[in-house]
A protein has these predicted regions:
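Amphipathic C-terminal alpha-helical segment
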Residues: 105-109, 147, 151-154, 160, ...
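N-terminal intrinsically disordered/low-complexity leader segments
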Residues: 1-19
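Generic hydrophobic, amphipathic alpha-helix propensity
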Residues: 20-29, 45, 66, 70-74, ...
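Hydrophobic alpha-helical connector segments
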Residues: 69, 83-113, 166-170, 193
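All-alpha amphipathic helical-bundle segments outside canonical DNA-binding/catalytic cores
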Residues: 94, 132-138, 153-169, 190-191
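Short hydrophobic clusters on alpha-helical segments that form packing/core surfaces
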Residues: 24-32, 103, 200
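Helix-turn-helix
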Residues: 23, 31-65, 69
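Short secondary-structure transition hinges
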Residues: 104-147, 154
Length: 205
């Protein structure tokens, strides 16, 4: 994550500044989910937030930085939720299942965030035209999932397998579950997650 630096160049932010940034990020999520990435201009986001475009420019250097902060904040909220659910789980099998179910639980209650993430991941580009997000930005996630699978192998709960392959498959399965749910909102997301957890439990034993 980027350094916490105010537009003035001073480190740290006041409570009011943090609240304003949160307001802008929340408005950005709504506009992106409703209108799509291309139509989510800073002017529209400012209008949704009930502020001037200049206020956004004070807190963010431009649309790209705001989009990156949306991703940072959403992923932080997911991680916070999952960590609470996984706290105290004593087995690798339990951690595996809890990870899948807790991520699902969080996103079920935050569908708008999920739609916004999908738009950003599909459209945000770096200055040289390359996708900002993708497999190349998933390393931290893969390593955290590998830790669960490695723990299971060390404890004897899981059979031997390539933990990187399993981590990639695990992540992809969750991503595709959510992608299907966005297109088919009546799909039973919780049932899908339970089936997925069952599938991975069988795959590692």
């Amino acid at each position: 994550m980027r350094p916490e630096i105010k537009p003035s160049g001073q480190k740290g932010r006041s409570f009011i500044e943090e609240a304003r940034r949160a307001q802008i990020i929340a408005a950005a999520i709504e506009v992106i989910a409703d209108l799509g990435f291309a139509r989510a201009s800073l002017a529209r986001i400012a209008e949704r937030a009930g502020i001037s475009k200049g206020v956004i420019s004070y807190h963010f250097t431009g649309k790209n930085e705001l989009m990156e902060e949306v991703v940072n904040q959403v992923y932080t909220s997911i991680a916070d939720h999952v960590i609470v659910r996984m706290d105290g789980v004593g087995t690798a099998t339990g951690l595996l299942r809890t990870h899948i179910l807790s991520v699902t639980e969080h996103m079920r209650g935050n569908r708008t965030q999920l739609k916004a993430l999908g738009e950003i991941f599909s459209n945000l580009r770096t200055d040289d035209g390359q996708p900002r997000y993708g497999i190349h930005t998933n390393e931290e996630l893969y390593r955290s999932l590998e830790a669960i699978y490695r723990l299971g192998q060390e404890s004897g709960e899981f059979r031997r397998f390539d933990v990187r392959v399993m981590a990639i498959t695990h992540s992809s399965a969750i991503d595709n579950m959510f992608a299907y749910w966005i297109v088919h909102p009546d799909h039973d997301l919780d049932a899908h997650a339970r089936e997925l957890a069952d599938l991975f439990e069988r795959a590692v034993s």
